[in-house]
């Protein structure tokens, strides 16, 4: 058991040892082969790859990365789903972070789904993280018609086409914060409830049908079971 636990910790820590924070879950998404995604993360959570033919292997920030190829008007979605450990409780605090490269000719009004663990797209309960109108959005729902929605929608928070960003969101049970390349871009106070959905997904909210998918690169996804500090998140910004 000690050997297994040690290997899991090493796999999860990865490049994060510098700031000392240990991810609860880590999806490198730099394996260069879709079939190896499960090998890299399967010991931590049961992983399923959605529509594997819609993944393109491209050069990424750390080895080969995956381009989630879900063009406009597409009805099947490239994604990576996994069973969220029952003990994980985002209402007590969490941080989500990922290296993201938006596509060329980003459609302004389209919703590019980064992370989905929610009972619904609009009210929750749960977490929904996406890009739309060239801005970073985080929605925390409690099941009511007034979810906590925070966006970077201003001149400084605009995301450019074909550009890598380190996007991050943290919540301490009261305050939600969003960051772009380590810089705080918005705060809001509110409450959320934990989703009752057993699985969460990266890159899409469903395999097919009426859903939202990502088009571009998602890499180095880390989920923490606490709200990281501004300093810890600033240390994560990608090298330009």
Give a label for each model feature.
Residues 18-74, 85-86, 233-240:
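Extracytoplasmic low-complexity segments
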Residues 188-217:
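Flexible glycan-contacting loops in extracellular carbohydrate-active proteins
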Residues 24-33, 95-104, 212-239:
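Extracellular, beta-strand-rich glycan-interacting domains
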Residues 139-166:
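Short, aromatic/His-centered strand-loop micro-motif at the edge of beta-sheets
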Residues 163-177:
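Localized edge beta-strand/strand-to-loop motifs within extracellular or lumenal beta-rich domains
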Residues 22, 86-104, 124-128, 163, ...:
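A carbohydrate-recognition surface predominantly in extracellular/luminal proteins
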Residues 112-140:
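Glycan-recognition/cleft segments
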Residues 69-94, 118, 150-158:
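Short surface loop/edge beta-strand patches of beta-sandwich-type extracellular domains
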């Amino acid at each position: 058991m000690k050997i297994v636990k040690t290997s899991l910790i090493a796999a999860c820590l990865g490049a994060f040892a510098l700031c000392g924070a240990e991810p609860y879950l880590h999806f490198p998404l730099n394996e260069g082969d879709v079939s190896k995604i499960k090998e890299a993360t399967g010991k931590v959570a049961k992983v399923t790859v959605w529509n594997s033919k819609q993944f393109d292997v491209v050069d990424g920030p750390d080895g080969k990365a995956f381009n989630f190829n879900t063009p406009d008007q597409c009805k099947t979605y490239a994604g990576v789903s996994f069973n969220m450990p029952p003990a994980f409780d985002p209402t007590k605090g969490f941080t989500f972070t990922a290296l993201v490269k938006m596509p060329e000719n980003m459609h302004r009004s389209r919703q590019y789904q980064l992370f989905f663990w929610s009972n619904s797209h609009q009210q929750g309960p749960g977490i929904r993280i996406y890009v739309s109108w060239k801005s970073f959005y985080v929605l925390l729902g409690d099941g009511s018609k007034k979810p906590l929605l925070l966006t970077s929608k201003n001149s400084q928070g605009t995301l450019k086409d074909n550009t890598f960003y380190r996007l991050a969101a943290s919540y301490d049970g009261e305050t939600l914060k969003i960051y772009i390349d380590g810089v705080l871009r918005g705060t809001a106070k509110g409450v959320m409830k934990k989703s009752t959905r057993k699985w969460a997904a990266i890159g899409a909210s469903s395999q097919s049908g009426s859903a939202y998918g990502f088009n571009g690169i998602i890499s180095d996804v880390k989920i923490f079971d606490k709200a990281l500090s501004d300093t810890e998140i600033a240390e994560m910004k990608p090298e330009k």
